Amino acid sequence: MLLDEIKRMSYDELKRLAEDIRKKITEVVLKNGGHLASNLGTIELTLALYRVFDPREDAIIWDTGHQAYTHKILTGRDELFHTIRTFGGLSGFVTRRESPLDWFGTGHAGTSIAAGLGFEKAFELLGEKRHVVVVIGDGALTSGMALEALNQLKNINSKMKIILNDNGMSISPNVGGLAYHLSKLRTSPIYLKGKKVLKKVLEKTEIGFEVEEEMKYLRDSLKGMIQGTNFFESLGLKYFGPFDGHNIELLEKVFKRIRDYDYSSVVHVVTKKGKGFTAAEKDPTKYHSASPSGKPKMLSYSDLLGHTLSGIAREDKKIVAITAAMADGTGLSIFQREHPDRFFDLGITEQTCVTFGAALGLHGMKPVVAIYSTFLQRAYDQIIHDVALQNAPVLFAIDRSGVVGEDGPTHHGLFDMNYLLSVPNMKIISPSSPEEFVSSLYTVLKHLDGPVAIRYPKESFYGEVEFFLENMKEIDLGWKILKRGREAAIIATGTILNEVLKIPLDVTVVNALTVKPLDTTVLKEIAREHDLIITVEEAMKIGGFGSFVAQRLQEMGWQGKIVNLGVEDIFVPHGSRKELLSMLGLDSEGLTKTVLTYIKARSREGKV
């Protein structure tokens, strides 16, 4: 595999290989979609790292995992790389199911240092001599989990090597004090000049690196006089850098030097997000996650959120918008441009975002916390303890609910409805269309008096923003009977309703816009008219909407049969939404077969 070949290559050959990999990643990602800019920035870093450390022996952990395409190419997946993010193909993230060289599955930011500590202690207890290396971005480093683990390194005598991949970005540009501190380390002209002079003096001596080792005290004193103790050194860690993250020869020397150090060290590497692809270099946020080529520009629910909130906020000065390093992804950059003083990007800090929103709401504001469903999981305690327990008026705009698609199991939004249903005071709304989404936002914000979650998918559609805003109105958030039939009643929530409406059977169809509280008036009406009720949801079936309906029907003393359709007890793989709904039996064809089976079975029992 390439992993062995790179150890025999000259630096000129490595540079050519880096360009070949850059070209390959660009071509495949522009075709399949994926994380382009992040991966173009870590090619040389990965080549240098794998010349010194070996993932067959050393635990190398890629935080978030979205920047590990070169790792995949080097570790035996070069021939399959064209399948990345396609159904049945390679994952866009690091996963143990794919290769034993993927030491720890990742997809969410900030987990790598804690995982590295766990592996390090396992190796120690088992008597195994292995290195632990973590590659983490400056954006992920701002997450609470990363900082918590960083704080433990000195305490448990870790020897972990942390490669800080600093490109000044997470998805959007980084924010906060730590980002400012890293920027100062990158750009301090006095320190950089002093370091350069010291390096030249050392290079002129006959014994080079040995003298540099002996003169550590002088170097550290120089750093201390110029810029004081940096953040990492204050935690008892050794800090090296910053270094050019695209200089393979330099990085290899640095990695060799720290490999056998008997203490934790941080190597600060500065890379350029989107390196080598002009469009991505100029707009790394846009190319952080590229969409497959050939798709026409369409509106998304995220776009509508930004435009809708901006419009409502012109009249309602109490509306504020909060996100966790996802201003563009959530559509809130639209709101930010018009209302910058009421927009807050708090970095990768979902827990902080929720509690920050709770306090805003408790003092008269109308906070909208917009976070992807998969990331909101990280703030479950804050949702319960800080928001719901105090009945704080906070609107959770839960983006990417349901089957997300090519990003796979780490990013599907299949748990939010389940984990929110059990929270007292929480209202849950699941619109079935863009029109319903816009009007639900308007209605909730007009009467916000406690926690409300509006969940919506990663879907695009044709339409003009003006059309949706002009038709925005206050609506009844209850259930609606859209179609009446004789053989069964189907209650669907969310955009999966559109698949249900395609079922060519004589059934009643109900749009359950509000998941919690249940619309018991409509439910009782349906229960009186039907002996077979089927619920459909694009979420985990266990403990979900269907279970909630079944419980209520049982409490009502209903004697019919209820069937819950949703995602079974599995982690859903990656693929297009169409492919995944088909696999799950939740597309119109699969639903028709399942519903017909139950209708026939009920008919044989003489119940329909």
Swiss-Prot record:
<feature type="binding site">
    <location>
        <position position="66"/>
    </location>
    <ligand>
        <name>thiamine diphosphate</name>
    </ligand>
</feature>
<comment type="function">
    <text>Catalyzes the acyloin condensation reaction between C atoms 2 and 3 of pyruvate and glyceraldehyde 3-phosphate to yield 1-deoxy-D-xylulose-5-phosphate (DXP).</text>
</comment>
<feature type="binding site">
    <location>
        <begin position="107"/>
        <end position="109"/>
    </location>
    <ligand>
        <name>thiamine diphosphate</name>
    </ligand>
</feature>
<dbReference type="GO" id="GO:0030976">
    <property type="term" value="F:thiamine pyrophosphate binding"/>
</dbReference>
<dbReference type="InterPro" id="IPR029061">
    <property type="entry name" value="THDP-binding"/>
</dbReference>
<dbReference type="InterPro" id="IPR005475">
    <property type="entry name" value="Transketolase-like_Pyr-bd"/>
</dbReference>
<keyword id="KW-0479">Metal-binding</keyword>
<protein>
    <recommendedName>
        <fullName>1-deoxy-D-xylulose-5-phosphate synthase</fullName>
        <ecNumber>2.2.1.7</ecNumber>
    </recommendedName>
</protein>
<comment type="pathway">
    <text>Metabolic intermediate biosynthesis; 1-deoxy-D-xylulose 5-phosphate biosynthesis; 1-deoxy-D-xylulose 5-phosphate from D-glyceraldehyde 3-phosphate and pyruvate: step 1/1.</text>
</comment>
<keyword id="KW-0414">Isoprene biosynthesis</keyword>
<dbReference type="GO" id="GO:0016114">
    <property type="term" value="P:terpenoid biosynthetic process"/>
</dbReference>
<feature type="binding site">
    <location>
        <position position="138"/>
    </location>
    <ligand>
        <name>Mg(2+)</name>
    </ligand>
</feature>
<feature type="binding site">
    <location>
        <begin position="139"/>
        <end position="140"/>
    </location>
    <ligand>
        <name>thiamine diphosphate</name>
    </ligand>
</feature>
<dbReference type="Pfam" id="PF02779">
    <property type="entry name" value="Transket_pyr"/>
</dbReference>
<dbReference type="InterPro" id="IPR009014">
    <property type="entry name" value="Transketo_C/PFOR_II"/>
</dbReference>
<feature type="binding site">
    <location>
        <position position="167"/>
    </location>
    <ligand>
        <name>thiamine diphosphate</name>
    </ligand>
</feature>
<dbReference type="Pfam" id="PF02780">
    <property type="entry name" value="Transketolase_C"/>
</dbReference>
<feature type="binding site">
    <location>
        <position position="350"/>
    </location>
    <ligand>
        <name>thiamine diphosphate</name>
    </ligand>
</feature>
<dbReference type="InterPro" id="IPR033248">
    <property type="entry name" value="Transketolase_C"/>
</dbReference>
<feature type="binding site">
    <location>
        <position position="167"/>
    </location>
    <ligand>
        <name>Mg(2+)</name>
    </ligand>
</feature>
<comment type="similarity">
    <text>Belongs to the transketolase family. DXPS subfamily.</text>
</comment>
<comment type="subunit">
    <text>Homodimer.</text>
</comment>
<dbReference type="GO" id="GO:0052865">
    <property type="term" value="P:1-deoxy-D-xylulose 5-phosphate biosynthetic process"/>
</dbReference>
<dbReference type="GO" id="GO:0000287">
    <property type="term" value="F:magnesium ion binding"/>
</dbReference>
<dbReference type="InterPro" id="IPR049557">
    <property type="entry name" value="Transketolase_CS"/>
</dbReference>
<dbReference type="InterPro" id="IPR005477">
    <property type="entry name" value="Dxylulose-5-P_synthase"/>
</dbReference>
<dbReference type="GO" id="GO:0009228">
    <property type="term" value="P:thiamine biosynthetic process"/>
</dbReference>
<keyword id="KW-0784">Thiamine biosynthesis</keyword>
<keyword id="KW-0786">Thiamine pyrophosphate</keyword>
<dbReference type="GO" id="GO:0005829">
    <property type="term" value="C:cytosol"/>
</dbReference>
<dbReference type="GO" id="GO:0019288">
    <property type="term" value="P:isopentenyl diphosphate biosynthetic process, methylerythritol 4-phosphate pathway"/>
</dbReference>
<keyword id="KW-0808">Transferase</keyword>
<keyword id="KW-0460">Magnesium</keyword>
<dbReference type="Pfam" id="PF13292">
    <property type="entry name" value="DXP_synthase_N"/>
</dbReference>
<feature type="binding site">
    <location>
        <position position="277"/>
    </location>
    <ligand>
        <name>thiamine diphosphate</name>
    </ligand>
</feature>
<dbReference type="GO" id="GO:0008661">
    <property type="term" value="F:1-deoxy-D-xylulose-5-phosphate synthase activity"/>
</dbReference>
